């Protein structure tokens, strides 16, 4: 019994550390990426379709609302807030879903369809935004049905999609760095195709690995719960 309690305490400490790290990284990416879209003379960090006048407005809405989701999302997973301040937990959840994920996913679909990054990022971003919306809807329906276990699982899946915005930047830097030795030979000294390759790989990797990691985590969590119930 003592060993079991100690194991649970260690797991709880690791969980708090992981959530704190996710919160810090999320805030850092918001401070880095979002402000460029909130000034009058927007300096977009991605290509804009000049022939589509509503491309930039949808991109601004997507950046701002996704930033809200990244800022408030991690606080949904602090157990102390859920247990001791349930009203705050519910308010933060509503802000996350209604001011963050809902407008962020819908505007993101439009921005994805108009992307200049190529067909692979286009399809990947559209699928991400559809899943982002769908998982939020499932989480909302679960909590309305008072199925809190399913609500937590769908919220974790949803935030894994949200957090892809953080990992995309990390993987982009990594894929650029590993290709730099190929710049002069394979790419003929042209950095643009190197960046395009790195960006496509980062988009796919950030989304696929985040969602795969979360499914593995949830499956292991359910397995541990089943074993714990048998003990």
Give names to the regions the model predicted:
Residues 1-231:
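Alpha-helical membrane insertion/targeting regions
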């Amino acid at each position: 019994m003592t060993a079991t309690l100690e194991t649970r305490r260690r797991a709880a400490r690791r969980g708090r550390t992981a959530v704190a790290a996710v919160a810090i990284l999320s805030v850092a990416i918001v401070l880095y990426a979002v402000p460029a879209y909130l000034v009058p003379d927007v300096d977009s960090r991605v290509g804009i379709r000049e022939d589509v006048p509503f491309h930039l407005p949808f991109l601004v809405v997507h950046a701002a609302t996704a930033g809200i989701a990244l800022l408030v999302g991690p606080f949904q997973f602090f157990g102390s807030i859920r247990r001791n301040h349930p009203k705050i937990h519910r308010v933060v959840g509503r802000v996350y879903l209604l001011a963050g994920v809902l407008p962020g996913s819908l505007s993101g679909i439009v921005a994805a369809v108009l992307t200049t990054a190529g067909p692979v990022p286009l399809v990947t971003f559209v699928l991400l935004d559809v899943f982002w919306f769908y998982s939020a809807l499932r989480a909302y329906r679960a909590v309305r049905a008072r199925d809190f276990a399913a609500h937590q699982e769908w919220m974790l899946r949803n935030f894994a999609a949200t957090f892809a915005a953080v990992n995309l930047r990390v993987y982009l830097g990594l894929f650029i760095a590993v290709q730099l030795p190929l710049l002069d030979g394979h790419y003929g000294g042209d950095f643009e195709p190197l960046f395009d390759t790195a960006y496509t790989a980062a988009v796919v990797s950030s989304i696929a690995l985040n969602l795969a990691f979360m499914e593995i985590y949830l499956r292991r969590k359910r397995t541990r719960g089943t074993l714990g119930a048998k003990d």
